[in-house]
């Protein structure tokens, strides 16, 4: 009956208690050191619950348990691990992850219930993939750029599907991309279909650990397939008969090696590159062309909107800052406020 139905808040508490009981039962079981070999260096290729796939120095991948003292382990982490020995004839013991090296960077995403969650580590570069289909959205590009600046990870903007552009369309797209080139961002124009522009992209990926970000349908998986080769193909669903756009199928973060050198972490977490956990000041700092004008407004509490004496707005009016970037800045702030309002309402729901 409806009167006995659990509320959302009660359901969350029941699920949380269940997960705590499961975790306690797992942690009670410790591991016998005699079952494992000598410590070795490795990198986490993927994480599955209480297990991780670790790649050793010789390129072999080993399924490992994780020491309960390790509080956080994600794809890209560099670790100390030990291989499992044969416990009995025909029975092999999984390896075990003993320790995690300090991270050079960590990619996170906000979560309504768990706060900020790490999804990948030691990223050198975030490749922001856009395309003219489903639409060329500068707002989405700007959101990713704010995330990159906040995480202090270098961005690379890649515009895919240029084979669909005629001369007029190419001129328009180049004009839009000049907005980013003019403020110091690198932009590459490619086609995963014709493979135009892939060579400069390969060079930009060599020697780095990258992660590809972008909205659904821009061809991230197709682009990765072209770069990785068929032996490492990241599968995509058949193109939708209704929309004509590819469907996203990646379910767990995983690290792949490019044949030309460099690595990529393919992760579904970047689809939800939320910014609502950031403060407005962090969003402002995420627009690099604003930096020279910060602190020069007439009022210290300037909102950089209709405030009198706003140095940033004056720069927009003088053409020193692109109007589209300024508009997207306020769209991001508005969307953050809306999401935080929904989150606060959800948190009070019993």
UniProtKB/Swiss-Prot annotation:
Subcellular location: Cytoplasm
Main location: cytoplasm
Annotated ranges, domain CP-type G: 104-273
PROSITE patterns associated with the record: ENGC_GTPASE, G_CP
Compositional bias ranges of the Polar residues kind: 1-17
Gene Ontology process terms (BP): ribosomal small subunit biogenesis
One annotated GO molecular function: GTP binding
Assigned EC number: 3.6.1.-
GO CC term (a single one): cytoplasm
Residues covered by region (Disordered): 1-24
UniProt keyword terms in alphabetical order: Cytoplasm, GTP-binding, Hydrolase, Metal-binding, Nucleotide-binding, Ribosome biogenesis, RNA-binding, rRNA-binding, Zinc
Binding site for GTP: 160-163, 214-222
Cofactor: Zn(2+)
Enzyme class: hydrolase
Coiled-coil blocks: none
UniProt: Zn(2+) binding residues: 297, 302, 304, 310
Cofactor note: Binds 1 zinc ion per subunit.
Function, in words: One of several proteins that assist in the late maturation steps of the functional core of the 30S ribosomal subunit. Helps release RbfA from mature subunits. May play a role in the assembly of ribosomal proteins into the subunit. Circularly permuted GTPase that catalyzes slow GTP hydrolysis, GTPase activity is stimulated by the 30S ribosomal subunit.
UniProt record similarity statement: Belongs to the TRAFAC class YlqF/YawG GTPase family. RsgA subfamily.
Record text on subunit structure and interactions: Monomer. Associates with 30S ribosomal subunit, binds 16S rRNA.
Name used for this protein in its record: Small ribosomal subunit biogenesis GTPase RsgA
Species in which this protein is naturally found: Salmonella schwarzengrund (strain CVM19633)
Classification lineage: Bacteria, Pseudomonadati, Pseudomonadota, Gammaproteobacteria, Enterobacterales
């Amino acid at each position: 009956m409806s009167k006995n139905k659990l509320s959302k808040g009660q359901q969350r508490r029941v699920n949380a208690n269940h997960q705590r009981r499961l975790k306690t039962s797992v942690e009670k079981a410790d591991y016998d050191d005699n079952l494992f070999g000598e410590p070795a260096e490795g990198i986490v290729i993927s994480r599955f619950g209480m297990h991780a796939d670790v790649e050793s120095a010789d390129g072999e991948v080993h399924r490992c348990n994780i020491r309960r003292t390790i509080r956080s382990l994600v794809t890209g982490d560099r670790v100390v691990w030990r291989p499992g020995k044969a416990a009995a004839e025909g029975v092999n013991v999984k390896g075990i992850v003993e320790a995690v090296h300090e991270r050079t960077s960590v990619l996170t995403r906000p979560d309504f219930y768990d706060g900020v969650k790490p999804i990948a580590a030691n990223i050198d570069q975030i490749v922001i993939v856009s395309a003219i289909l489903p639409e060329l959205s500068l707002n989405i590009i700007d959101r990713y750029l704010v995330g990159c600046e906040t995480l202090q990870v270098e961005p690379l903007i890649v515009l895919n599907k240029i084979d669909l552009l005629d001369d007029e369309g190419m001129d328009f797209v180049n004009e839009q991309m000049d907005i980013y080139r003019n403020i110091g961002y690198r932009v590459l124009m490619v086609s995963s279909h014709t493979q135009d522009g892939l060579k400069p992209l390969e060079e930009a990926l060599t020697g780095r650990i990258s992660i590809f970000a972008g909205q659904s349908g821009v061809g991230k998986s197709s682009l990765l397939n072209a770069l990785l080769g068929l032996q490492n193909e990241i599968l995509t669903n058949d193109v939708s008969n209704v929309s004509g756009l590819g469907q996203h199928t990646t379910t767990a973060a995983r690290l792949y090696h490019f044949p030309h050198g460099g690595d990529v972490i393919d992760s579904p977490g970047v689809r939800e590159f939320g910014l609502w956990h950031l403060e407005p000041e962090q969003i402002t700092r995420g627009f690099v062309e604003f930096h020279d004008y910060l602190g020069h407004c007439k009022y210290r509490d300037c909102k950089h909107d209709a405030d009198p004496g706003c140095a940033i707005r004056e720069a927009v009016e003088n053409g020193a800052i692109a109007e589209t970037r300024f508009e997207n800045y306020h769209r991001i702030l508005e969307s953050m406020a809306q999401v935080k309002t929904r989150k606060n309402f959800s948190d009070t729901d019993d």
